Amino acid sequence: FLNPFRWVINKYREWKNKKDS
């Protein structure tokens, strides 16, 4: 499993990308 912090950043970036689109 990846570093939880990196996982959170990845999910946040994904969410932000969907929200901005």
From Swiss-Prot:
Recorded family membership: Belongs to the cationic peptide 04 (cupiennin) family. 09 subfamily.
Molecular function per GO: toxin activity
UniProt keyword Secreted present: yes
Keyword annotations of the record: Amidation, Secreted, Toxin
UniProt note on tissues of expression: Expressed by the venom gland.
Any Gene Ontology CC annotation: extracellular region
Residues with PTM Serine amide: S21
Chief location bin: secreted
Compartments it resides in: Secreted
Protein name (database record): Cupiennin-6e
